[in-house]
């Protein structure tokens, strides 16, 4: 058998490099997609953090409100004097 020519060897090397470049390009494309997903996730987490902060602010405002005033005591009813000859109701 004859030895492969130098051009054949170069062609084989170029094909091997091309195959490796294609594999690397596939990985880079996947990394780009993953980074877009991470950016979207980062945005969502930022929005969630803002909402949680808003809720915490609302809850802390309620805690800072003054206590409502105590209800006014009911006035005491005056004593009804006993009047001779008058019957009182038993409902009292």
From Swiss-Prot:
InterPro entries: NPV_P10. Gene3D superfamilies: Designed single chain three-helix bundle. Keywords: Late protein, Viral occlusion body. GO terms for cellular component: viral occlusion body. Residues 60-92 are annotated as: Disordered. Seems to be involved in the morphogenesis of the polyhedra. Forms extensive fibrillar structures in both nucleus and cytoplasm. It is involved in the liberation of polyhedra from infected-insect cell. Belongs to the baculoviridae p10 family. This is Protein p10. It comes from Orgyia pseudotsugata multicapsid polyhedrosis virus. The gene is P10.
């Amino acid at each position: 058998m004859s030895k492969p020519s130098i051009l054949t060897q170069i062609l084989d090397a170029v094909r091997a490099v091309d195959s490796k470049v294609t594999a690397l390009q596939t990985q880079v494309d996947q990394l780009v997609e993953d980074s877009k997903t991470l950016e979207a996730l980062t945005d969502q987490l930022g929005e969630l953090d803002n909402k949680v902060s808003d809720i915490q602010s609302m809850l802390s405002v309620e805690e800072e409100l003054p206590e409502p005033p105590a209800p006014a005591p009911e006035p005491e009813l005056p004593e009804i004097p006993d009047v001779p000859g008058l019957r009182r109701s038993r409902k009292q």
